[in-house]
Amino acid sequence: SVKDPIWKYRWVEAHEPENFKKIYKWLDIKEYLILRASGEFVMTQDSAFGTLLYDTRKGHEGWCKPVCDMVGVKMEHLAPIKKSTEKVGEVTESAAKELGLAPGTAVYGGGGDASLIGVGAGATEVGDTHIYSGTSGWVGTVVEKQTVDTGAMIAAIVGADPDTFNYFAELETSNKCVGWVKDHLALDEIGVFLKKYGNAADSLEQTEFNLYDYLEEVIDTVPAGSNGVVFTPWLH
């Protein structure tokens, strides 16, 4: 999980001190892949923001030393920050052989899912809104200023465009909840399901697929309001 990176860093420091002593730079997964491809140690703005150590104030963008000092993160472990749209290096000879790419192919900073899903959905201009539903889910709107609504637990985060923010109302478990319902509730109806689908459920893979189909059919028969049933799906 990308959550709570600071405390994972501190955990390694406390429980694996010998490994901690060997640290050169602290990278996210995407940045590690950039390193493997190009040999460059960098971190994009959205990844830096995800560490909670990035100063987003205009004119102050960069690692925030006071916060790093407060939580015990060493500044020398933090990589230079780059824009998502910035060329950060080129594919090395060794990486080119592994990847089947031409040596010297440009490597860009890129972005994480929260940054690039909006781009893929076409939500790139101020006011554009998109809805995403995967394992997690959110409603996101491109805004000009960083905004926080502590009452509604909604905040604007750094995205792929360095000049705007993504105002996110996020749910940790969206379609993951559908999987939970399938595993914990729908299997109680397996007799009904098998009777209906018969040999179509011979393999586990088909059972997984067809159970979702069966769920959708059942859901289609439920009236608006679900007869008063409320599901609050903040699952772990």
Regions found by a protein language model. Name each.
Residues I29-K30, S174-C177, K182:
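Extended catalytic-interface subdomain
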Residues S1-K3, L52-Y54, P162-S174:
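A short glycine-threonine-serine/GTX helix/turn-capping micro-motif
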Residues S38-G39, M43, N199-H236:
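Conserved ATP-utilizing enzyme core subdomain
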Residues H15, R36, E40, G122, ...:
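Active-site catalytic microenvironments for nucleophilic, acid-base chemistry
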Residues D4, K8, S115, T173-C177:
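Catalytic-loop motifs flanking and including active-site residues across diverse enzymes
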Residues T56-P162, E172-T173, L185, E189, ...:
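ATP-dependent carbohydrate kinase catalytic cores
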